[in-house]
Amino acid sequence: YAYDAGRTGSKTVVLCEEDDDAQEINSREKEELIGVCKYQPSYQLLHTVMRYDRKDRIKRSGMLKAIGVYGFNNTKRILLSLALARVLSESGNTLFISFEVFSCLGNILKSESTENLSDALYAFRQNHNQFHKNIVNAINHCDRLDYIPEADCAEDIADIKPEEICTFVQGIGREMGYSYIVIDIGDCIRMPWDVLGCCDKCYMTLGDDYIENCRIKNLEKYMIEQGMDNIVQSINKVQVKLNVDITMDDLWGKLPFNDFYEELKSTLNPGEE
Protein backbone atom coordinates (compact mmCIF):
# COMPACT_ATOMS: atom_id res chain seq x y z
CA TYR A 1 0.00 0.00 0.00
CA ALA A 2 1.59 3.28 -1.10
CA TYR A 3 1.29 6.24 1.23
CA ASP A 4 1.61 9.67 -0.36
CA ALA A 5 3.49 11.82 2.16
CA GLY A 6 3.25 14.96 0.09
CA ARG A 7 6.50 16.92 0.16
CA THR A 8 8.31 14.04 1.85
CA GLY A 9 7.74 11.79 -1.16
CA SER A 10 5.98 8.45 -1.42
CA LYS A 11 6.42 5.93 1.37
CA THR A 12 5.39 2.31 1.67
CA VAL A 13 3.36 1.15 4.66
CA VAL A 14 4.16 -2.38 5.82
CA LEU A 15 1.47 -4.04 7.95
CA CYS A 16 3.16 -6.28 10.52
CA GLU A 17 2.00 -9.05 12.81
CA GLU A 18 4.07 -7.82 15.78
CA ASP A 19 5.11 -4.43 17.19
CA ASP A 20 8.74 -5.58 17.25
CA ASP A 21 8.66 -6.18 13.50
CA ALA A 22 7.20 -2.72 12.91
CA GLN A 23 9.88 -1.08 15.05
CA GLU A 24 12.61 -2.96 13.19
CA ILE A 25 11.28 -1.68 9.86
CA ASN A 26 11.05 1.88 11.17
CA SER A 27 14.72 1.72 12.17
CA ARG A 28 15.65 1.51 8.47
CA GLU A 29 15.49 5.25 7.98
CA LYS A 30 16.82 5.25 4.41
CA GLU A 31 14.38 2.70 3.01
CA GLU A 32 11.29 4.98 3.01
CA LEU A 33 9.24 2.32 4.83
CA ILE A 34 6.70 2.73 7.61
CA GLY A 35 6.12 -0.34 9.77
CA VAL A 36 2.73 -0.55 11.49
CA CYS A 37 1.24 -3.31 13.62
CA LYS A 38 -2.07 -4.17 11.97
CA TYR A 39 -3.77 -5.36 15.16
CA GLN A 40 -4.99 -1.98 16.43
CA PRO A 41 -8.00 0.31 15.90
CA SER A 42 -8.06 1.99 12.50
CA TYR A 43 -7.74 5.50 13.94
CA GLN A 44 -4.55 4.51 15.79
CA LEU A 45 -3.16 2.90 12.65
CA LEU A 46 -3.78 6.08 10.66
CA HIS A 47 -2.33 8.17 13.49
CA THR A 48 0.89 6.13 13.42
CA VAL A 49 1.27 6.49 9.65
CA MET A 50 0.67 10.24 9.74
CA ARG A 51 3.18 10.68 12.56
CA TYR A 52 6.06 9.82 10.23
CA ASP A 53 4.91 12.37 7.66
CA ARG A 54 4.72 15.03 10.39
CA LYS A 55 8.14 13.98 11.67
CA ASP A 56 9.74 14.78 8.30
CA ARG A 57 7.95 18.12 8.00
CA ILE A 58 8.76 19.20 11.55
CA LYS A 59 12.41 18.21 11.16
CA ARG A 60 12.66 20.57 8.21
CA SER A 61 10.78 23.47 9.79
CA GLY A 62 12.14 23.17 13.35
CA MET A 63 8.67 24.03 14.64
CA LEU A 64 8.61 21.96 17.86
CA LYS A 65 7.47 24.05 20.84
CA ALA A 66 7.87 22.90 24.44
CA ILE A 67 5.25 24.31 26.83
CA GLY A 68 6.14 24.16 30.54
CA VAL A 69 3.52 24.36 33.30
CA TYR A 70 4.40 24.96 36.95
CA GLY A 71 2.61 25.92 40.16
CA PHE A 72 2.35 25.10 43.86
CA ASN A 73 -1.17 23.69 43.73
CA ASN A 74 -0.81 20.27 42.13
CA THR A 75 -4.46 19.83 41.19
CA LYS A 76 -4.74 23.21 39.50
CA ARG A 77 -1.42 22.73 37.74
CA ILE A 78 -2.48 19.37 36.29
CA LEU A 79 -5.81 20.87 35.16
CA LEU A 80 -4.01 23.77 33.47
CA SER A 81 -1.58 21.36 31.81
CA LEU A 82 -4.42 19.23 30.48
CA ALA A 83 -6.32 22.28 29.24
CA LEU A 84 -3.26 23.57 27.36
CA ALA A 85 -2.66 20.14 25.87
CA ARG A 86 -6.28 19.89 24.75
CA VAL A 87 -6.29 23.35 23.14
CA LEU A 88 -3.00 22.74 21.31
CA SER A 89 -4.02 19.26 20.15
CA GLU A 90 -6.81 20.86 18.13
CA SER A 91 -4.28 22.60 15.89
CA GLY A 92 -1.16 20.43 15.93
CA ASN A 93 0.34 17.08 16.81
CA THR A 94 0.61 17.33 20.62
CA LEU A 95 2.16 15.15 23.33
CA PHE A 96 1.45 15.57 27.05
CA ILE A 97 3.94 14.40 29.68
CA SER A 98 3.33 14.74 33.43
CA PHE A 99 6.38 14.65 35.67
CA GLU A 100 4.13 14.67 38.73
CA VAL A 101 4.28 11.61 40.97
CA PHE A 102 0.82 10.02 41.36
CA SER A 103 -0.76 12.50 38.91
CA CYS A 104 -3.66 10.15 38.02
CA LEU A 105 -3.15 11.00 34.36
CA GLY A 106 -3.79 7.40 33.34
CA ASN A 107 -7.06 7.44 35.29
CA ILE A 108 -8.20 10.76 33.82
CA LEU A 109 -7.48 9.78 30.22
CA LYS A 110 -8.40 6.08 30.59
CA SER A 111 -5.02 4.59 29.77
CA GLU A 112 -4.95 0.90 28.87
CA SER A 113 -1.21 0.79 28.28
CA THR A 114 1.07 -1.53 30.21
CA GLU A 115 3.96 0.91 29.72
CA ASN A 116 4.35 4.41 31.13
CA LEU A 117 6.81 7.23 31.82
CA SER A 118 9.02 4.94 33.91
CA ASP A 119 9.53 2.69 30.86
CA ALA A 120 10.16 5.68 28.60
CA LEU A 121 12.75 7.15 30.98
CA TYR A 122 14.46 3.76 31.27
CA ALA A 123 14.76 3.58 27.47
CA PHE A 124 16.13 7.13 27.48
CA ARG A 125 18.80 6.33 30.05
CA GLN A 126 19.88 3.26 28.08
CA ASN A 127 20.38 5.15 24.81
CA HIS A 128 19.91 8.92 24.52
CA ASN A 129 20.15 8.84 20.72
CA GLN A 130 17.79 5.98 19.82
CA PHE A 131 15.41 5.81 22.80
CA HIS A 132 12.44 7.12 20.80
CA LYS A 133 12.23 3.78 18.97
CA ASN A 134 11.55 1.98 22.25
CA ILE A 135 8.82 4.18 23.72
CA VAL A 136 6.10 3.75 21.11
CA ASN A 137 4.11 1.41 23.38
CA ALA A 138 4.19 3.98 26.19
CA ILE A 139 2.40 6.59 24.08
CA ASN A 140 -1.39 6.55 24.49
CA HIS A 141 -4.10 8.45 22.64
CA CYS A 142 -7.15 10.39 23.85
CA ASP A 143 -9.11 12.15 21.13
CA ARG A 144 -6.42 14.11 19.23
CA LEU A 145 -3.96 14.14 22.12
CA ASP A 146 -1.01 11.80 22.64
CA TYR A 147 0.19 11.29 26.20
CA ILE A 148 2.52 9.14 28.27
CA PRO A 149 0.90 7.75 31.46
CA GLU A 150 2.51 8.83 34.73
CA ALA A 151 5.53 6.98 36.11
CA ASP A 152 4.76 4.04 38.40
CA CYS A 153 8.02 4.49 40.32
CA ALA A 154 8.44 7.78 42.21
CA GLU A 155 12.24 7.48 42.14
CA ASP A 156 12.21 7.71 38.33
CA ILE A 157 10.94 11.28 38.66
CA ALA A 158 13.02 12.26 41.68
CA ASP A 159 16.27 11.05 40.10
CA ILE A 160 16.01 12.76 36.72
CA LYS A 161 17.98 15.97 36.21
CA PRO A 162 16.51 19.10 34.58
CA GLU A 163 18.91 18.90 31.65
CA GLU A 164 17.88 15.27 31.09
CA ILE A 165 14.22 16.30 30.93
CA CYS A 166 15.11 18.88 28.29
CA THR A 167 17.06 16.34 26.23
CA PHE A 168 14.28 13.76 26.65
CA VAL A 169 11.57 16.17 25.47
CA GLN A 170 13.58 17.56 22.55
CA GLY A 171 14.50 14.04 21.43
CA ILE A 172 10.88 12.91 21.36
CA GLY A 173 9.76 16.02 19.54
CA ARG A 174 12.52 15.82 16.96
CA GLU A 175 12.25 12.11 16.21
CA MET A 176 8.49 11.55 16.56
CA GLY A 177 7.16 14.60 14.78
CA TYR A 178 5.36 16.60 17.47
CA SER A 179 4.48 20.25 17.03
CA TYR A 180 3.88 20.74 20.76
CA ILE A 181 4.95 18.94 23.92
CA VAL A 182 3.22 20.08 27.11
CA ILE A 183 5.26 19.38 30.26
CA ASP A 184 3.58 19.20 33.66
CA ILE A 185 6.49 20.09 35.98
CA GLY A 186 5.81 18.19 39.20
CA ASP A 187 6.93 18.77 42.79
CA CYS A 188 9.63 16.10 42.70
CA ILE A 189 11.54 17.76 39.87
CA ARG A 190 14.81 19.23 41.10
CA MET A 191 15.35 22.87 40.11
CA PRO A 192 12.07 23.24 38.17
CA TRP A 193 13.14 26.72 37.06
CA ASP A 194 15.80 25.09 34.90
CA VAL A 195 13.09 23.05 33.15
CA LEU A 196 11.11 26.26 32.58
CA GLY A 197 14.28 27.70 31.09
CA CYS A 198 14.33 25.14 28.28
CA CYS A 199 10.66 25.69 27.38
CA ASP A 200 9.48 27.94 24.57
CA LYS A 201 6.54 29.14 26.64
CA CYS A 202 5.80 28.92 30.37
CA TYR A 203 2.57 28.90 32.36
CA MET A 204 1.90 29.06 36.08
CA THR A 205 -1.26 28.75 38.15
CA LEU A 206 -2.23 31.79 40.24
CA GLY A 207 -2.64 31.31 43.98
CA ASP A 208 -5.93 31.37 45.87
CA ASP A 209 -4.49 32.24 49.26
CA TYR A 210 -1.80 34.30 50.96
CA ILE A 211 0.67 31.45 51.46
CA GLU A 212 0.49 30.21 47.88
CA ASN A 213 0.95 33.72 46.49
CA CYS A 214 3.93 34.27 48.81
CA ARG A 215 5.52 31.09 47.50
CA ILE A 216 5.09 32.33 43.93
CA LYS A 217 6.68 35.69 44.80
CA ASN A 218 9.59 33.99 46.56
CA LEU A 219 10.15 31.75 43.54
CA GLU A 220 10.19 34.75 41.22
CA LYS A 221 12.58 36.60 43.54
CA TYR A 222 14.95 33.63 43.56
CA MET A 223 14.84 33.27 39.77
CA ILE A 224 15.59 36.97 39.29
CA GLU A 225 18.55 36.69 41.66
CA GLN A 226 19.80 33.78 39.53
CA GLY A 227 19.66 35.90 36.38
CA MET A 228 16.43 34.41 35.05
CA ASP A 229 14.58 37.73 34.70
CA ASN A 230 13.56 36.95 31.13
CA ILE A 231 11.89 33.68 32.18
CA VAL A 232 10.01 35.34 35.06
CA GLN A 233 8.73 38.07 32.75
CA SER A 234 7.60 35.54 30.15
CA ILE A 235 5.53 33.36 32.50
CA ASN A 236 1.81 33.42 31.73
CA LYS A 237 -0.22 33.22 34.94
CA VAL A 238 -3.68 31.66 34.82
CA GLN A 239 -6.41 31.54 37.46
CA VAL A 240 -7.69 27.96 37.37
CA LYS A 241 -11.18 27.44 38.74
CA LEU A 242 -13.72 24.76 37.91
CA ASN A 243 -17.27 25.99 37.45
CA VAL A 244 -18.77 22.85 38.94
CA ASP A 245 -17.61 19.73 40.71
CA ILE A 246 -16.24 17.33 38.14
CA THR A 247 -15.64 13.65 38.75
CA MET A 248 -12.67 11.72 37.43
CA ASP A 249 -14.92 9.97 34.91
CA ASP A 250 -15.85 13.15 33.06
CA LEU A 251 -12.95 15.52 33.80
CA TRP A 252 -11.47 15.41 30.29
CA GLY A 253 -14.84 15.83 28.61
CA LYS A 254 -15.94 18.71 30.86
CA LEU A 255 -12.73 20.76 30.66
CA PRO A 256 -13.95 22.92 27.73
CA PHE A 257 -17.02 23.99 29.73
CA ASN A 258 -15.03 25.91 32.33
CA ASP A 259 -14.40 29.65 32.17
CA PHE A 260 -10.63 29.34 32.55
CA TYR A 261 -10.53 27.02 29.53
CA GLU A 262 -12.33 29.53 27.34
CA GLU A 263 -10.10 32.36 28.56
CA LEU A 264 -7.04 30.23 27.88
CA LYS A 265 -8.26 29.37 24.40
CA SER A 266 -8.98 33.01 23.56
CA THR A 267 -5.48 34.15 24.55
CA LEU A 268 -3.57 31.20 23.08
CA ASN A 269 -2.94 31.34 19.36
CA PRO A 270 -1.30 28.01 18.49
CA GLY A 271 -0.31 29.27 15.08
CA GLU A 272 1.97 31.82 16.72
CA GLU A 273 3.38 29.61 19.49
Spell out what each predicted region is.
Residues Q130-I139, P149-I185:
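Cytosolic-facing regulatory segments adjacent to core modules
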Residues T167-N258:
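Conserved catalytic-core segment of NTP-binding enzymes
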